[in-house]
Amino acid sequence: MAEIKNYTLNFGPQHPAAHGVLRLVLELDGEVIQRADPHIGLLHRATEKLAESKTFIQSVPYMDRLDYVSMMVNEHGYVLAIEKLLGIDVPIRAKYIRVLFDEVTRVLNHLMWIGAHALDVGAMAVFLYAFREREDLMDVYEAVSGARMHAAYYRPGGVYRDLPDAMPQYKASKIRNTKALSKLNENRQGSLLDFIEDFFNRFPKCVDEYETLLTDNRIWKQRLVGIGVVSPERALQMGLTGAMLRGSGIEWDLRKKQPYEVYDQMDFDIPVGVNGDCYDRYLVRVEEMRQSTRIAKQCIEWLRKNPGPVMTDNHKVAPPSRVGMKSNMEELIHHFKLFTEGFHVPEGEAYAAVEHPKGEFGIYLVSDGANKPYRLKIRAPGYAHLSALDEMARGHMIADAVTIIGTQDIVFGEVDR
């Protein structure tokens, strides 16, 4: 009898479940995966090399475009590395604003993840619900920075500006009548902080909705339980971080273990899984959304009571005020120099890591004393996770490959960078 050979299948790069531009070369025995070989680099934009020809501040917008669903957290790692090299202090209010927006970004990321993951597995409704909530958070981004996605809001030494006192409101148009407008603008009457607080007061109920649809859903559990199991030892060996590591039962979160900004003053818990399968990672991320809500509420409470500066008073780094610029020639020259030549960073190297929604996002920065980085290395969490795909998918059905890609929460901007 003739021997049955394995056959090879190309999964992606234009597959809807490939999360962008992933090309998987699958070796199959019938419908069982024997080997999964990820091919990356289809979204490579040479970010690390581009940064070498840009001033330090000009590379901030590049960070937004790495993991383009967790924009501000990428910026955070980068500005922390610059601040380490410069040795400057950040005003306490700016630290709280950064932590607040890190958590807003974490929720943004997890909403995208739960919607896309559920859609891949076959649950349509969650995707629509998740995007309903994301819309409000995108409006928060827009109110504070003027952009819905690529905010470029963090700066070395603080943030671009303080939180606005008024929330932008919807205006009448062909598709929105006055009655619909009044309902949409109902919670936009106050400041940005009021709007964020209102969102996080409503949000736990929204998370309950997602859990009602998924957590005890028979089909959801059949598709996730026991799929892509990673043991705690193996998770550490493969360099997994974030929810991928915590799902395997290892309590590691940089916000607790190596606190930065004001996370050491925040009261929150680290959710940890037991079995290390896709279902545990799902539960960990859902609980992370609840913990982010707790942190955000603490930040809002503090920010209400404590006004103050949001940018360092070190004039080598901070641009002069608009008012000063229009009345003082020296300040105008200083502003011009700062945005053309940029500031010079002392010689040295620094590594700064933040707890990104996907794992540990690190920036290794080398300076030779010039106004541009000598070398910028980005440690993307998704890169290590994707390398574990082969091991996680072996022995599973081809349909489970989709579940495993979903649970890894991969975005190719940061993998290919």
UniProtKB/Swiss-Prot annotation:
Pfam family, one: Complex1_49kDa
Protein name per the record: NADH-quinone oxidoreductase subunit D
Family: Belongs to the complex I 49 kDa subunit family.
Keyword Cell wall biogenesis/degradation attached: no
Catalytic activity: a quinone + NADH + 5 H(+)(in) = a quinol + NAD(+) + 4 H(+)(out)
Quaternary state and interactors: NDH-1 is composed of 14 different subunits. Subunits NuoB, C, D, E, F, and G constitute the peripheral sector of the complex.
Subcellular location: Cell inner membrane
HAMAP family, A to Z: NDH1_NuoD (MF_01358)
Broad enzyme group: translocase
The keyword Transferase appears for this protein: no
Main location class: membrane
Matches recorded under InterPro entries: NADH_Q_OxRdtase_suD, NADH_UbQ_OxRdtase_49kDa_CS, NDH1_su_D/H, NiFe-Hase_large
Membrane topology: Peripheral membrane protein
Protein role: NDH-1 shuttles electrons from NADH, via FMN and iron-sulfur (Fe-S) centers, to quinones in the respiratory chain. The immediate electron acceptor for the enzyme in this species is believed to be ubiquinone. Couples the redox reaction to proton translocation (for every two electrons transferred, four hydrogen ions are translocated across the cytoplasmic membrane), and thus conserves the redox energy in a proton gradient.
GO CC field: plasma membrane
EC number: 7.1.1.-
GO molecular function terms attached to this record: NAD binding; NADH:ubiquinone reductase (non-electrogenic) activity; quinone binding
Gene3D superfamilies documented for this protein: Cytochrome-c3 Hydrogenase, chain B
Keywords for this protein: Cell inner membrane, Cell membrane, Membrane, NAD, Quinone, Translocase, Transport, Ubiquinone
